Amino acid sequence: MSGGAISIFGELNAHTYLGKAFFSSINYKIHQWPECRRRLGRRLMGPAQAAGPGKSSVDERNPNAAAATEINTNASIPLLQRECESFDEIQDRLTMMQDQLSRLTATLDNKQNLVDRVDQIGDKQSSMPTPPSTGHVVSDVDGQIQRYHGPWTLLAQCRQLESDLASWSKADHAAEVASLVTSMVQETMRVPSSSLSSFHTEIPGMGMCLPPRQLLSVMVECFLKNADYATSIFDHQSLYCAIDRVYRDPSNPEEKPWVLCFNLIILLTLGAEHSLQSEDPFVRPMLQAVQTAAGNSRLLMEPRLVSVQALALFSLFMQQCYPDNEPLGDGIFAQACVLARQMGLPQPHGYAATPSTLTAAEVDERHRVYQSLYIRNRYATTTSGALMWLPNSIMCTGTASAVGAHWELAKLQDEIHRVLGSCSFGSSDRRIKVAQLREKLRVWQEACLVAETQPMSMDRVILCLLFLGTRIYISMDNKETDTESFLDDCRLSCLLLIVSCTKHLRPDFSNQFHHLLRRLNPSRRNSDGSAHSSPSSTPSSSSTSSPLPSPASERPPPLDVVTRPSTGTSTPSSPTLLPLPRLANAFPITAIFILARHILGISAEGKPINTHRTVTEINSDILLLESLLFCFQNNPPFLGGKDQTLHCSYKLGQVLDHLVRIVHTMTSDRTSPRAHASGLPLVTEHAEMTDYMSRMFMTSKGSPASDLTGLWYPRDVTSDTPMELSIPDFQSVWPTPQDSLASSTNPLATAEGSIYTPALHPTPIIPNTPLDLSELFGFTNSDASEVWNLGTETTDLLENRRPSLKRQRTHFESQ
């Protein structure tokens, strides 16, 4: 029991003791009241009545005695009045004590409800299938470095699964499962000692240098055009002015944060299309500049707006380069938030202490920076349990149209965290608050998720993933983990990643994907009719009598309400895949653990679930997790190198690898994708596909589940990837707009428009590996390093070869 409840009990007992003593005195006075009344009566009646009838009460011969009797009678009247007033005071005190006892009782009831929720005793709200609310503190081998992992982080989820599986007592596989779980937890706790220096060789004599101005001009145009909630942190005119100022005086040490920003803009823009190679002669100098900036504490500690912007881009770059080392990017992001608070960016309208010194453009840019940091912080808290570094947004008004939907969702997530993380609400108040939050989330969904984005855009997929992650977060807190809609949110989250990052898709996954999208949109679900609204039409359903979703030829474009009109005849073309690093940061990590528990038939605390599950549903979910694992393994990293290991570079992918192996071990005797040999059906339409998929994902107990490259695929069935099935008349789930077919370049992922938006004509065609732009700027590989030398001769040479920023921008506008 908490200390507050104990103090309330003590106060109540004290008041009870005092009340008993007071009531005892009242009872004594009540018992004494008849005797007092008799004494008063005798004094009022006088000596005559006291002597008996027939006797005179006043001695006529003694006038002094008569006067004394009158005095005694007059003196008795105030005494009677005082006695009556004392009883009125007693009644008032009784009323006051009754009110105090009522308040104490109500306070005690509220404290008892709080104790029940915290201690998980007797209250339904207490049995939450979540990790311990205190989280985990992990130390390194020497105990010098300690890191806190909150209750929704990846490590906490692994620890919770370890606790849930501890009660699983299957004798033939218990030891193997325990070993796999321990390995998963240890892998999650391990923090690699990766740094920028481990991915490239340092160039002697080259520090933090400016990139070629012509390259920067091209990349800045693409960067600003494709800016999203994470990169929309610059005022365009201010950025162009900074470029002119820095290149006029490149040796000014005060402009070093801008030099870091320029290099990061190029790296992030190039990495949005292709995996960067650390050995590339053009990428190496930019990585060298970033590494030099990382060692300059003064550069990243000064409370300047450009320092916050540089840290914001730096953290985004590190999170994509090193997805297996979360503290590396999270620490840089935390420093950006600390500087933002020191500068007063969370204040209304971005003002500082003296708002008159800021222009309208500066106010807008400060607000952009704060919005971007705030959105990223709330998104990370919802999807992966990151710490909150920025205060809430109650005092902030207005938002840029480019990030309006993200801004509103982030504010809604902030409200959700405050409500679900508060202990001041009772059970009934909490349910009312949660219902109100669900309604607000539904309103946001109808306003922002349906009609305001284009098919296959990076921004749209991220919005959908974050919306699903928010709904999963609310359902997890309210113990709604067995409902079909909750499981469908987890399945759709996995399918969004698979569809966005995989060339081809299994037809049953494609049907399930479109059906879940239709159910996600209430207006579309109602318009499609009751025939398609049944949850049994998904491959994971327990019933097969309901009709399947409409065929591929009749489906609307995914994540879009209205089909855009065609501008011409189309030709077959593979859809452009989205980069996994950005999508992985928006993926709700809880989804894979929920599906794994559903497959294994356990809930939190290791208890069996009551939901009816079919073999078809279990097999479908297993294949879904395996397909997601292959998606993590098959996608190239954001930054690669010749010495890079072949294992999955994503921490979530490594955990998913262990999770799939645990599922295989625990379901080997019941059902799994390799159980077709025992006659159990799989979720495929033909026997040939059943045999293929069972061999595709089957792993021996002696080899890790992540080693999918070593599986025995028949060469007459497989193609480039295990999921590239040769299916006639199979239509890709993502439509290819006509405007993408005429472009000769691979476009960058757009934030507001389609991924297929053609790139600018001056944008160079970036080869896969290595990245070589020497022909574009008129020099060979041998003298490529001279580009980054800011000496007088080299600078003059480059100025003769590249146009000025003003002429370059005029050239873009003419295009």
UniProtKB/Swiss-Prot annotation:
Q: Where does the record place Pro residues bias? A: 548-559
Coarsely, its chief localization is nucleus
GO cellular component assignments: nucleus
Specify residue ranges for compositional bias: Low complexity.
523-547, 563-577
Q: Where is this region: Disordered?
A: 522-577
What are the protein's UniProt keywords? Nucleus, Transcription, Transcription regulation
Q: Which GO terms describe its molecular function?
A: DNA-binding transcription factor activity
Subcellular location(s): the record lists: Nucleus
Record's keyword annotation contains Hydrolase? no
Keyword Nucleotide-binding (UniProt): no
What's the stated role of this polypeptide? Putative transcription factor that may be involved in the regulation of the expression of the gene cluster that mediates the biosynthesis of phenalenones such as herqueinone, compounds that have been reported to treat tumors, bacterial infections and/or mycoses, and rheumatic diseases.
Instruction: Please report the name of this protein according to its UniProt entry.
Output: Putative transcription factor phnE
